[in-house]
Amino acid sequence: MASCPDSDNSWVLAGSENLPVETLGPEPRMDPESEGASQALRDSSKADGKELAGTLDGEEKLFQTESSQRETAVLTESAAKGTLGADGHGTEAPGDTVVQEDSQETPVATSLGPDTQDLESEIHPQNLPSSPRAVWKEHRCSSSDDDTDVDVEGLRRRRGREPSSSQPVVPVDVEDQAKGEGIGGELGISLNMCFLGALVLLGLGILLFSGTLLEPETGPMEEAELQVFPETGPETELVETLGNRQDEIEHLQASSVPPDSVPSLQSMGFLLDKLAKENQDIRLLQAQLQAQKEELQSLLHQPKGLEEENARLREALQQGKTSHQALESELQQLRARLQGLEANCVRGVDGVCLNWGGDPQDGKATKEQGHKGQEPDPSLLEQHKQLEAEAKALRQELQRQWQLLGSVHWDLQRGLRDAGRGAPAHPGLAELGHMLAQTLQDLENQGINTGRSPNDSEAWHQKKPHTQSPREWGGKEKWRGGQRDQKAEHWKPRKEESGQERQRSWRDEGREHTGRWREDRLRADESGSRKDSKRQDPKVHPRKDGNSHSVERQKHSWGKDNSPDALSSWEELLRRKYRPPQGCSGVADCARQEGLALFGVELAPVRQQELASVLREYLSRLPWAGQLTKQLPLSPAYFGEDGIFRHDRLRFRDFVDALEDSLEEVALKQTGDDDEVDDFEDFVFGHFFGDKALKKRSRKKEKHSWNPRVVGPREEHSRHPHHYHQG
């Protein structure tokens, strides 16, 4: 009979042949508590093994190779039990042969169920057997201890050697395994739950990052979450925790997305697409933020340039203020000087300053005395210069007044000449002419006293500068009509003044004689009534239509009488201002309407070359107009690029009237008479409209001029020929 290998005593086979004694090993010393615990562990292990035999299919496959060997060992053990069953306790008895350690193991299924874990937690890890093999060994040893006092036939027991230590020797790997199983029993569920919780938190984090939990379409994801955590029993959870972690992750993914859940896959694809779009939006936002950052950095560098610009602007503003202050001071000085000059000014009845406080000759003498003595004040020198300039301007004004009086005298002479031809003359016309002749003689005398030679006065008188009619000039002076009555009362007393009083300053004398002439304009207006009757007719000669051309002709004729250049009269045409036609649009339309209004015949647009040939033909008749033919007044201001007259900007009859006025001025300068060019308008209009239109127009003019309803009592003398108005 074999004994326990860890017992103190050894069983020896006794026989007649005196077989050799085989030592089976020392008998383990175990206390009753350890034996009870091991017995309970063995019973519970067997019970749990039977209960979990159906669930641990994976473990049975792992022990299939060992089960065949263990069946042979069990059969041998059962045979030994039958031989050694004399003790009556149903324990295993050793056979005639020594049972190997590998054949003594029985298949015991280990499990980490809750009952086993609770039992193992109550037992100290050092007292727990490391495996079912150890449990079987303890069971054998305990059965051997029970049979120590029983005599077995053919066997005898002897005392073996004592072990080196009082405590049983437990292998290190067995102890570590026991400790690990104890710890696993305590923390197995908590670690698995922590692992599952970490997976759940990871999934929730992914869902939160993608934003799917914030959307209303959460049906498929909720189903997936329900599938991730199915309600299974504790045994299934424990079995799953024993598997590989990779298998659990794959199982989790397979359970969360089943193969037949197509809508869930579509929703996941939709979520992935949306996530990609959101990532793209995030990249765009990052690019915008980067651009804004760069812009802010550039704006941070700009204040330096702005500060420099502000400094320049401040400097410019300061300079402007300084210049403004200087100009204000200069203006104050000019105002003070002007007030001083006005204080010394002697004003006439009409409010015009007649004397500025001294004669220019006195100023020259004062200036010479200042040079002889000491240097005068620069302000005084400047004042003297201004006075000299004013004196020069006054001389020019006086010259213009002389020219005006000469033109009036010439008009009166022509009126008297026309009256001698049979026209009724006004009773006071001869007296007015005599008074004007006397005035001119007085002015000539004053011209001699002021340094003008009598020859100059006579030459000027012979040239007879032609200006606007007395009626037209009287229209300019209507605003002074309130003072004419007062001046008329003093006409005769002033005429009889002594020669000493006439020797006053040339400025005062000129003003006085000008005033005398203005007083007599009321009488001279009657002589120009014939021109007024012509102006009332809208179809009369274009040159007599308005006052603008005659007024401008007089303005431009002043100061031009002594000029030898006859082409200056052409240049005056460019300075005229013409009234544009009304009620038409376009060159052709305006030309047609003008012809119908003037002659009752449509006028074709005038061409520059045609008009130039007409002018050359007419000027060739005049012996003194050779210079005028060299440069005709056909500037681009009157003709377009195509050579067509600009009928839409000015009327053609106004342009012809201006040409006639210029020719009259040249005729006055060259011959002293402008009657030579009286037929200029008829010549030009006869070329463009025909002689029939001119005859028709002349008959209308005669009929209109002899109509008693049009001609007033003072306008009877206006029935005389047309050339009277050329003056």
Swiss-Prot record:
<feature type="modified residue" description="Phosphoserine">
    <location>
        <position position="131"/>
    </location>
</feature>
<dbReference type="GO" id="GO:0005829">
    <property type="term" value="C:cytosol"/>
</dbReference>
<dbReference type="GO" id="GO:0061975">
    <property type="term" value="P:articular cartilage development"/>
</dbReference>
<dbReference type="GO" id="GO:0005654">
    <property type="term" value="C:nucleoplasm"/>
</dbReference>
<dbReference type="InterPro" id="IPR051990">
    <property type="entry name" value="CCPG1/PBIP1"/>
</dbReference>
<feature type="compositionally biased region" description="Polar residues">
    <location>
        <begin position="446"/>
        <end position="456"/>
    </location>
</feature>
<feature type="region of interest" description="Disordered">
    <location>
        <begin position="694"/>
        <end position="727"/>
    </location>
</feature>
<comment type="subunit">
    <text>Interacts with ESR1, PBX1, PBX2 and PBX3. Interacts with TEX11.</text>
</comment>
<protein>
    <recommendedName>
        <fullName>Pre-B-cell leukemia transcription factor-interacting protein 1</fullName>
    </recommendedName>
</protein>
<keyword id="KW-0539">Nucleus</keyword>
<dbReference type="GO" id="GO:0002532">
    <property type="term" value="P:production of molecular mediator involved in inflammatory response"/>
</dbReference>
<feature type="modified residue" description="Phosphoserine">
    <location>
        <position position="142"/>
    </location>
</feature>
<dbReference type="GO" id="GO:0005874">
    <property type="term" value="C:microtubule"/>
</dbReference>
<feature type="modified residue" description="Phosphoserine">
    <location>
        <position position="563"/>
    </location>
</feature>
<dbReference type="GO" id="GO:0010467">
    <property type="term" value="P:gene expression"/>
</dbReference>
<feature type="region of interest" description="Disordered">
    <location>
        <begin position="1"/>
        <end position="169"/>
    </location>
</feature>
<dbReference type="GO" id="GO:0003714">
    <property type="term" value="F:transcription corepressor activity"/>
</dbReference>
<dbReference type="GO" id="GO:1901148">
    <property type="term" value="P:gene expression involved in extracellular matrix organization"/>
</dbReference>
<feature type="compositionally biased region" description="Basic and acidic residues">
    <location>
        <begin position="473"/>
        <end position="563"/>
    </location>
</feature>
<dbReference type="GO" id="GO:0005634">
    <property type="term" value="C:nucleus"/>
</dbReference>
<dbReference type="GO" id="GO:0003713">
    <property type="term" value="F:transcription coactivator activity"/>
</dbReference>
<dbReference type="GO" id="GO:0005737">
    <property type="term" value="C:cytoplasm"/>
</dbReference>
<feature type="coiled-coil region">
    <location>
        <begin position="377"/>
        <end position="405"/>
    </location>
</feature>
<dbReference type="GO" id="GO:0000785">
    <property type="term" value="C:chromatin"/>
</dbReference>
<feature type="modified residue" description="Phosphoserine">
    <location>
        <position position="164"/>
    </location>
</feature>
<dbReference type="GO" id="GO:0005667">
    <property type="term" value="C:transcription regulator complex"/>
</dbReference>
<feature type="region of interest" description="Disordered">
    <location>
        <begin position="446"/>
        <end position="565"/>
    </location>
</feature>
<feature type="short sequence motif" description="Nuclear localization signal">
    <location>
        <begin position="486"/>
        <end position="506"/>
    </location>
</feature>
<keyword id="KW-0963">Cytoplasm</keyword>
<feature type="modified residue" description="Phosphoserine">
    <location>
        <position position="143"/>
    </location>
</feature>
<dbReference type="GO" id="GO:0030097">
    <property type="term" value="P:hemopoiesis"/>
</dbReference>
<comment type="function">
    <text>Regulator of pre-B-cell leukemia transcription factors (BPXs) function. Inhibits the binding of PBX1-HOX complex to DNA and blocks the transcriptional activity of E2A-PBX1. Tethers estrogen receptor-alpha (ESR1) to microtubules and allows them to influence estrogen receptors-alpha signaling.</text>
</comment>
<feature type="short sequence motif" description="Nuclear localization signal">
    <location>
        <begin position="691"/>
        <end position="716"/>
    </location>
</feature>
<feature type="modified residue" description="Phosphoserine">
    <location>
        <position position="144"/>
    </location>
</feature>
<feature type="modified residue" description="Phosphothreonine">
    <location>
        <position position="148"/>
    </location>
</feature>
<dbReference type="GO" id="GO:0045893">
    <property type="term" value="P:positive regulation of DNA-templated transcription"/>
</dbReference>
<dbReference type="GO" id="GO:0140297">
    <property type="term" value="F:DNA-binding transcription factor binding"/>
</dbReference>
<keyword id="KW-0175">Coiled coil</keyword>
<feature type="compositionally biased region" description="Basic residues">
    <location>
        <begin position="694"/>
        <end position="703"/>
    </location>
</feature>
<dbReference type="GO" id="GO:0007155">
    <property type="term" value="P:cell adhesion"/>
</dbReference>
<dbReference type="GO" id="GO:0030177">
    <property type="term" value="P:positive regulation of Wnt signaling pathway"/>
</dbReference>
<feature type="coiled-coil region">
    <location>
        <begin position="270"/>
        <end position="350"/>
    </location>
</feature>
